[in-house]
Amino acid sequence: MVWAKVETGNGAFSSQMETCSPSDAESWWFLPYDQLNLDLLPVQDSIGIILIESEKQAKRRPYHKQKLCYILSNMRHFALETLSKAIPVVYVTTNEQYDEPLRKLAQDFGPMNMFRAAERELRLTLSELIIEGHILEHPHPGWLTPQDWFTETVGNEPPFRMDRFYRRVRKEKGWLMEGDSPVGGKFSHDADNRQPWKGEHQPPQAPSYTIDEIDEEVIALVNHRFAEHPGEARLNHLPTSYKDHRQALEFLSEILTLFGPYEDAMTKESRGLFHSRLASSVNIHRVLPEEIIDVVVKADVPLNSQEGYLRQMIWREYVHHVHEITDGFHSLDIHSTVPFNRTAGWPMNVDQDKSKHPNHLNQTRSLPMAFWGQTSGMDCLDWAVESVMDEAWTHHIPRLMVLSNLAQLMDIEPRQLTDWFRAAFVDAFDWVVEPNVLGMGTFALGDAMMTKPYVSGTPYIKKMGDFCSSCKFHPTKSCPISPMYWAYFERHKEAFTGNHRLAMTLRTSQKRSDEKKANDMETFLHVTETLSKGKSLHAQKTLFSNE
């Protein structure tokens, strides 16, 4: 068996690959697209690595071109880096799913080893091969916490809450601990991490990376084979080689001091502010999570920045456990619906999954093209979407409090929003995007993960960002977001009745005059219908009043 050439002729990548046979290694490991690190392996002697590019998987949904470039270039760089260590590599390209070439490889290579796939989707694809013994599945060493830590502190069934798990992990690992007590006397410093950015500290420039011949070849391939996908094929701001990912890790030290206080801030002056942009590296294991945490806990920086970043890393473990223990939420007894389509509205033909997905509030509107780059007229939304279309990324507050918030207020079908995040963001995989969007960004899971929905009106966005100053809508006189906020609670008041966390909000909603309630609903309908037609919003005297 020899690896398959990625391009006909002697391309930059194919010309550097070597042929190999089953006898070149005593054991062979299949490493998927998100396990690209030899340090995951128990040993590196007498092993061989199998990597597979699946065009069918890449066309399963409308992935951003930069996400495709990122995955493919990292796989190819990793293959060459592995070869440089005298470890044989079988590199297969296929227009089938991963299981077909693996089944063929098993005929020559025998049973192949594999760490348990992080993504449920990949586990389902490979399940028959595992049952048949063609793949020998091992625990995934990339996770920092065993599942029993989760079940012993959180449980096997909802409601799932993070706090006890977070404390257990801190104590077990000794991260920012003095004996059994947290450094600083408390586990959470979240209250210190809510400052808006007013320009008082200049954020560093995001890392940029040299484009090499492997990157160039991948960019050309993506433009040729995936022309119908959204976004622009670029890699200058994404790490692809081992050296690039070391540079990405070094950037963490540059931003960590001010990460905490400005963790929730947004500004048109800087997309990243003091965020590390490391999620894309760690989610494919080019940088290991323990490497990141080691930098954080040893850093000489304010405690609120250390604890805030550590909390993000433990949240990553937490959502993985939630997703796995609920079988991707398929085992939960929650009202579910079948999405209209699985492309989040992007004009592309894909195999349509007809299964039901959580939709606690029965939200059924289609995602508007404003999420794919058409101008909405709201500066906060247009800024966030522009960042996604340009870089396949924003930090977590625009994701939660702009993109997800506005989708919730517009009653967008939750699975469509989830599909959009998964396709559009370079760091999105099912185990992380589904809990974050279905469980937190929307209220699709009910109170399974959150006690109340994360929604806000104009005041929060005005406080934590600077979009209102340049927006056509006045924040208190004509912005549609606050009327939509109140319309949301009026529409779904029955679903929230009895929720003590929302008691004050519901009382305030009930006290609004009939005239205001009518304006709220009219605003909601005008915004959703205008955006559904691909049009931009304009300020109107009779609508959007917050007074």
What are these regions (language model features)?
Residues F13-M17, L31-D39, D99-L105, T125, ...:
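Short alpha-helical segments and helix-capping/turn motifs at coil-helix boundaries
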Residues Q35-N37, K56-Q57, E119-R120, G142-W143, ...:
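Short, solvent-exposed loop/turn segments at secondary-structure junctions
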Residues G11, S23, Q97-L238, L438:
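Beta-rich, aromatic/charged-enriched effector core domains that present basic-aromatic interfaces
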Residues V90-Y98:
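Short beta->alpha junction loops
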Residues V2-V90:
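N-terminal beta-strand-loop-alpha-helix module at the start
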Residues I49-K56, H77-L80, A118-E128, I135-D180, ...:
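Alpha-helical membrane-anchoring segments
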Residues A4, C20-P22, P32-Y33, A265, ...:
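C-terminal catalytic domain of photolyase/cryptochrome flavoproteins
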